[in-house]
Each structure stands twice: as C-alpha cells, then as structure tokens.
Curated annotation (Swiss-Prot):
Domain of life: Bacteria
Provenance organism: Leuconostoc mesenteroides subsp. mesenteroides (strain ATCC 8293 / DSM 20343 / BCRC 11652 / CCM 1803 / JCM 6124 / NCDO 523 / NBRC 100496 / NCIMB 8023 / NCTC 12954 / NRRL B-1118 / 37Y)
Family statement: Belongs to the arabinose isomerase family.
Disulphide bonds in the chain: none
Keywords, alphabetical: Arabinose catabolism, Carbohydrate metabolism, Isomerase, Manganese, Metal-binding
Record-level GO cellular component terms: cytosol
GO molecular function, one term: L-arabinose isomerase activity
Keyword set includes Metal-binding: yes
Cofactor(s) recorded in Swiss-Prot or TrEMBL: Mn(2+)
Cofactor details (free text): Binds 1 Mn(2+) ion per subunit.
Protein's UniProt name: L-arabinose isomerase
The reaction(s) this protein catalyses: beta-L-arabinopyranose = L-ribulose
The protein's annotated pathway: Carbohydrate degradation; L-arabinose degradation via L-ribulose; D-xylulose 5-phosphate from L-arabinose (bacterial route): step 1/3
Length: 474
C-alpha cells in the first residue's frame, strides 16, 4: 500500500525512586523482556521500543515531548510495573499529542504463593499501580486505550496490534488529501459537508480540480505503458469480451487503463491519497472511470463517487487500519425483504473495490445509462462471506458522527445476468429491520465503507481519538 511510512511505538514504564536502584533496574529489564517477546509474537504490525522508566514528572514529561516531535513514533504504550505516583504523569500526559495505550498487565501471570514476600509485592504491584495511573488519565478526560490482561496472551497481543493500526491511521489521517474532480452530484445532501471542520477534526485536506486538469494527464499517458498493463492484468483478471467485438472491447478496456495511469500520476505528483469523480462532469473523458477507479482502490487509494469526499477520505483511512485488506467503497442499492432472506444488495455504477472479491474478477464492457459517455470497462465479481462493518460519516452542522453497524456478508443467492457490476450482499447483525431503522434514524449516508478487516472496537478507538460521536447500531 502506497505511502505509509515505517512507524514504531514507545514503551514507558511507570515506577518511582522509593524502591531503590535494584528494583528500578529490574523494572527496566522486565520491560525490555516484555517488549522483546511482544515484538517476536507476530501479532503486532509495528515494533515497540523501550523508551524509559518514568520515575519523575521531569523525565516522563521529557519522554512525551520527544514522542511528539519524533515523526516515526505513532503512539506511546505505558505500564505501571510498581506503584507510580500519578501526579508525575500529569504534565507529560497533557502535552502528549500521540495516541496512548495503557497496558494493564503484570510480569508474571500467576501469584507465586509458595515464595511471595514483600520484595515481590513491591516489584509486582501492577494491580495497585495501574489503578493510580488510570485514575489520572480518567481525571484528565483522556481518550486513551486500555488493554487488560497478561502480555503473553495472544488475545491481549491481538488487541494491542489492532490498536496500533488505529493509532497509525490516526497519525496518517492528518496527511490524507482528497482531490475532487468536479464537485459533488447536484442537489444531493448527505455527501456534502464542512471541509474546514473536517480538516480541523480529521486532518483531511479537500481540493477541487477541474476535469480538464485530469484530462491533460490522461491524454499524456504513453500507449506502450497501456499495452504493457493490458497484458499484465490478464494474469490477474479474466478478460471477457462478451457481446463486444474484439476491437471495441480492447479499446474501451485500454482507455480505462489510460485513465488509471493518468489519475494515478496526477495523485502521485500532487500528493493526494484519495479522489472522487462525478458522472455529471466528464468533459474531455471518453468514459466514467470504472476499472480505473477499481484498480486505484486496489492500490490503496481512497475513492467515492459523486464527489463524496467524506467517504473517499474514510475509505482511505480504513484502508490504512486494515492494511488495504478487504475494505471497499460501497453503496446500499436494493433490498430483499422476504422473511428468512432479509438482506441488502450493495454495489455502485462501476466502482466497487476488488479487495472484497470472492472470485476472480472479470474485466467486462457494458453500456452505462448515465454519464452520456462510451461503454465503460469494469471489474465484475461477487463479494465475500463473513463478518464485516459498514461505516459512514455524516455532517450534522454542529458535529460529525461516525455511524456503523456490524454485518454478515454473503454472496448473492443467484446470478444477475442483467446487472454486470461488482456486488456484495449483507445483512445487519441487528437484523435488517432494526439495522435499517437505526441507520435511518441517526442519519447515516447511502455511501459507506464496508470492511471485513476492521471491527467496531477499532471504530470506537478512532472516534475517541478524533473526539467525534460514534453511533454503533446494535
């Protein structure tokens, strides 16, 4: 996935001088041992580095200030090995502007009844120290994450790893730049929003560029590059001409590849990580980008149709959380309301992300009833089965809300010979009726990001970091 730097996390262990140098030495050794084992576990997507034992307000504050100014540090993990007077943490914690995880753990996972004494108690009093430390975080009204359990347990490691992905996404969010080629679809409400507030809250920069600026890039692509990509993609996808003659099919597919290479070069040259198109404004383009948009999403770029910059940025954000695994721009289209079959069929005109494909996508060319352009090439496939989340962001004037529900993904019950697009079937775990009523009541949009790799706990953590309301429909 393009343009995600190598991040790391710092580990700061709480203690105090009261216990003497030998105990502090042991605290550091234990901390380094835990970090070594965590890094070796294979459950963490980013490495942890030991930073310091926090024993005074001064050295804790210095560590947090250094974390702020080290761009390679995505967050800080803390643990109170011994008792750690929480007043020492106040200033440093106030200054920290990186994500914070409090790991409430213990060096050993048991109580050594046959050998325990007060020396052991002084060294291993995380149950005591973590409460003191957690209090000051609560008192400061922090949006920090708490993970409780033994550090060697896989479930704890997985939870830390998922939080790491959220923390990195939070840091990267302030680098997300969205280009809108033309404005949003005319007269549509939910795709609109306050771009200034979005930049304040999420760090998203949203810029308008005319389609003519894009056309210049598209027309400048070398034919040889298109020909090479056309051959390369035949190993990845099935090329199905169908009712098209071979000349038309090849031309229309290659034009989408021209658009793909042109848009990608534009995004790369100007530092954008997400984009939108609008079928109402395609002057100078032969086709609405379909296959082109799908290939760019597969590369990790965010996308949404009809100028929906919020969903384009959200899709990019969740692709960072998920490492671009099974995370796609989506739209609710039509319903199955029969008892025992309740489901939503999600799709879009063309642009569904192939990272959720369950079968080998087919490159097909078919007419498109809107846009007034040539028949666009697109990837056609069925989505996957399994647990997923469907997520949207809506702007209510006084606040943004992150809205989601858990869903069960399924494949369509039958083929759709007259609907040659990629599609995904799902049912809200709350039930179609309760899920739909909840979504409609809170004002969730019709454009979403559907992810089989992100969960509601991570969405909760994201909302907490950004300081926005999270509505999890159950």
């Amino acid at each position: 996935m393009a343009d995600i730097k190598d991040y790391k996390f710092w580990f700061v262990t709480g203690s105090q001088f009261l216990y003497g140098p030998e105990v502090l030495k042991q605290v550091e050794e234990d901390s380094k041992k835990i970090i070594e084992k965590l890094n070796e576990s294979g459950n963490l997507p980013y490495p942890i580095e030991f930073k310091t034992v926090g024993v005074t307000a001064e050295n804790i504050t210095e560590a947090m200030k250094e974390a702020n100014y080290d761009d390679s540090v995505a967050g800080v993990i803390t643990w109170a090995h011994t008792f750690s007077p929480a007043k020492n943490w106040i200033r440093g914690t106030q200054l920290l502007n990186k994500p914070l995880l409090h790991l409430a753990t213990q060096m050993l996972n048991n109580i050594p009844y046959d050998s325990i004494d007060f020396d052991y108690m002084n060294l291993n009093q995380s149950a005591h120290g973590d409460r003191e430390y957690a209090f000051i975080n609560a008192r400061l009204r922090l949006n920090n994450k708490i993970v409780f359990g033994h550090w060697a347990d896989e479930a704890v490691q997985v939870q830390i790893g998922k939080w790491m992905d959220v923390a990195v996404a939070y840091e990267e969010s302030f680098k997300i730049k969205v280009v809108t080629f033309a404005d949003k679809m005319r007269n549509v409400a939910v795709t609109d929003g306050d771009k200034i507030e979005a930049q304040i809250k999420f760090g998203w920069t949203v810029d308008y560029w005319g389609v003519g600026d894009l056309v210049t890039y598209v027309n400048a692509i070398d034919d040889a590059d298109i020909d090479n990509l056309y051959i390369e993609l035949q190993d990845k996808y099935d090329f199905v001409a169908g009712q098209n003659d071979s000349e038309k099919y090849e031309h229309n597919v290659k034009y989408q590849l021209r658009e793909y290479l042109g848009i990608k070069r534009f995004l790369t040259d100007k530092g954008y990580s997400a984009f939108t198109t609008n079928f109402e404004d395609l002057v100078g383009l032969e086709q609405l980008p379909g296959l082109a948009a799908q290939l760019l999403m597969a590369d990790g770029f965010g996308f949404a149709g009809e100028g929906d910059w919020k969903t384009a940025a959200l899709t990019r954000l969740l692709k960072i959380v998920s490492h671009n695994q099974a995370t796609a721009f989506m739209e609710d289209y039509t319903l199955d309301l029969r008892q025992g079959h309740e489901a939503i069929l999600g799709s879009h005109m063309l642009e569904v992300d192939p990272t959720i494909a369950s079968d080998k996508p087919r490159v097909e060319v078919h007419p498109l009833g809107i846009g007034g352009k040539e028949d666009p090439a697109r990837l056609v496939f069925s989505g996957r089965t399994g647990d997923a989340v469907d997520v949207t962001i809506s702007d209510f004037g006084d606040e943004f809300k992150l809205i989601s529900y858990d869903v069960t993904g399924n494949k369509p019950e039958a083929e759709t010979p007259y609907l040659p697009v990629a599609k995904q079937l799902w049912t809200p775990k709350a039930g179609l009726k309760a899920g739909a009523e909840g979504w409609l009541t809170v004002g969730g949009g019709h454009h979403t990001t559907l992810s089989f790799s992100v969960d509601s706990e991570q969405l909760t953590d994201l909302a907490n970091l950004f300081g926005v309301t999270y509505v999890d429909i159950k």
